[in-house]
């Protein structure tokens, strides 16, 4: 006998011959297929949408009085660890902002704890109001230049595809490995048919070769011209708006009725305080609309476009057979989420989050000595330059004497990266753009190897900040004069198992401390990317300065 049709038990409710569990009456429903609005009712049974129209009756009925109903929002690419929250706390926080699905790459924790880290994140996803679907970390470590806590080759990953919660292969950051035909890199690309890319500034024949190898999405575009070229080549465009990476304003012009099916929103890296105070994908919608994008196109980017890109036909639209994931909002331009439903239930009805205790060590290092963080040299020096609103850096040169650092008048500070895995290696460099006046910050979040990174106006305050992070077993610290503010992160030195409200309060305290230090907003997020060797142009690792364009170590003083 043939298998029964999908949702055969729901056919009577869909036909209206049996009552639905819930019918939302008198709603304005967003049609993600045509990017338009339709007045009507929404009928739900067993967590599935069974129909729209005017003829449905329900065991429970609710009159929305013309309120707008939008499919549940989808984040196309995120690293949950960057929120500083474990998945349970993260899910409850973003669900309140209309998000019901996130496509997450757990490569932060995988770089520290390997397969054990991935298993931890998978175990955290059960029973949440947000469906967390994971992309397997493809680059652990990010490049051969990085020394982290784990190495995952294709054989290590082979047992994950097909498991519940695993959707595909995460961002392929090792662009030189792809273009060079590295067998180990190519072996990973055949593990899944859904393969995310990572191709900052890649263009022309190299972009063609990268696409030919399998990755077909990118969230690293920072200019409209770059985005247009990648769309023309068939890539999916993830328009990013994170804590530091703010690309919506530059990329809105490329989103049209003709390209919107290939465009989605993502947040990539967002601290919990930004999520709580400003929002998640709902914030992306508001930002895009304020930048001139039609609300209906923005809504399509947040719903159906990512669902189709990731081959998720059970969500992304208010249509029969799809999950009853949706949010009720005030108007499409201001997009204030009043209520979120996940699988037909208000997210407020989901059980309070219960964090799983981590089972792996965070730090295996000691505080470096003053001699280890000294920098020697005189003359032309390579300096890492921050770029406001981006994780890209500039490769700058200054005439200076290392013994005279810091040079507050020219905004030149010392930057230090300490190996967290017990190897004892320490890299020292110079950074421009923080604007600190007096103090230092340090953190055990340092993409992607997550060594301990610090920047400050003097050796004493830098060492104080490093000491605070290491004594906490991982976390973030700010030092101003003798005042030390610390946010411990007890899960791998990346996340906290404490409630979101406590983490947000800790972040608020750190923000107050950094305001006393002076300088840019959210310096911790900028700091966390200064060791990321897969993003141009200049980086610092625990081995020293790294040219991320030439892909080689370079001296501070040539």
Swiss-Prot record:
Disulfide bonds: none
Keyword terms, alphabetized: Hydrolase, Manganese
Gene Ontology MF terms: adenine deaminase activity
Cofactors: Mn(2+)
Hydrolase is among the record's keywords: yes
Pfam families, alphabetized: Adenine_deam_C (PF13382), Amidohydro_1 (PF01979)
InterPro entries found in the cross-reference section: Adenine_deam, Adenine_deam_C, Amidohydro-rel, Metal-dep_hydrolase_composite, Metal_Hydrolase
Swiss-Prot/TrEMBL catalytic activity: adenine + H2O + H(+) = hypoxanthine + NH4(+)
Enzyme Commission number, as recorded: 3.5.4.2
GO BP annotations, alphabetical order: adenine catabolic process
Domain of life, per lineage: Archaea
Assigned protein family: Belongs to the metallo-dependent hydrolases superfamily. Adenine deaminase family.
Name of the protein this chain belongs to: Adenine deaminase
Organism per entry: Methanoregula boonei (strain DSM 21154 / JCM 14090 / 6A8)
Gene that specifies this protein: ade
